[in-house]
Each structure stands twice: as structure tokens, then as C-alpha cells.
């Protein structure tokens, strides 16, 4: 499975939100079977979270967006604003969307939601900026 836009956003929409609203989002990622090789080809060193990334059963990337669909399209196309993890991992699906009133609110919520997910899903590596 991979990210399919805008269809993957539709289950999270309601009467008060549109695809272009600000939000915090969580993407399920899949690591390549040769993660170390792929990583070493793209980057000069491995991050301090390397062991967590490798040992976790699942990987989730949490991000904030001023315009949700635009940011997800950036992730999907990888033409602009690449992230480290999506440069080496494939996006499997959009796991969740938390709508926010604006980008400032989304940035504040991103950290809180990341920590909540880390605490709630011990077998998952949760990455945010």
C-alpha cells in the first residue's frame, strides 16, 4: 500500500475541515530490508535514534502542516521538503490526522501527539522533527 491522495485524507474529513486546512498527521512507514545500506548510501552518519529505528516493529512519522494536502503531496513526490525518514523509507499509509486551527497550533500539537504515540505504542518508533 502507498499514499493515495486525496483519497487517504477523506476518512478524516468532516463538515468543518478541508484538505487544505492545518493539521498534524501521522504516516506509517516501511523500512527497506537493507536499511543500513540504503541509509549509508544517502547519509554520512547514522543518527542517535538508529537503534530504535532498526529494532522497532513499526515506524511512524509525525509532522505538522499549514496545508495538509500540499504537505502530503510533498512527502509523496519527494520533490521538495524531503524528510530524512521518507528519503529511506516508503510511505505505507496515512495513519491519522488531527485538525488544527492554524500552523502555530499544529506545531504545538505535533510534539504532544508524538509523545503520546511514543507512550501508547511501545513497539513503534515515532519520529517527528
What are these regions (language model features)?
Residues 86-92:
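Charge-biased low-complexity segments
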Residues 16, 85-86:
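Short secondary-structure boundary/capping segments
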Residues 117-129:
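Coupling/hinge elements of helicase-like and P-loop NTPase modules
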Residues 1-66, 70-73, 104-112:
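GIY-YIG nuclease catalytic motif and its immediate N-terminal context
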Residues 74-78:
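Residue-level signal for well-ordered alpha-helical positions
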Residues 59-62, 92-102:
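A short, exposed loop/beta-hairpin motif centered on an aromatic-Gly-Thr core
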Amino acid at each position: 500500500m502507498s499514499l493515495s491522495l486525496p483519497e487517504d485524507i477523506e476518512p478524516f474529513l468532516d463538515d468543518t475541515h478541508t484538505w487544505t486546512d492545518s493539521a498534524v498527521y501521522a504516516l506509517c512507514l516501511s523500512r527497506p530490508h537493507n536499511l543500513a545500506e540504503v541509509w549509508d548510501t544517502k547519509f554520512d552518519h547514522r543518527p542517535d535514534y538508529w537503534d530504535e529505528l532498526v529494532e522497532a516493529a513499526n515506524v511512524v512519522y509525525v509532522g505538522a502542516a499549514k496545508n495538509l494536502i500540499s504537505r502530503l503531496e510533498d512527502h509523496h513526490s519527494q520533490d521538495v521538503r524531503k524528510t530524512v525518514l521518507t528519503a529511506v523509507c516508503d510511505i505505507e499509509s496515512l495513519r491519522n490526522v488531527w485538525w488544527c486551527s492554524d500552523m502555530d497550533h499544529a506545531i504545538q500539537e505535533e510534539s504532544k501527539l508524538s509523545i503520546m504515540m511514543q507512550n501508547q505504542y511501545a513497539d513503534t518508533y515515532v519520529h517527528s522533527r
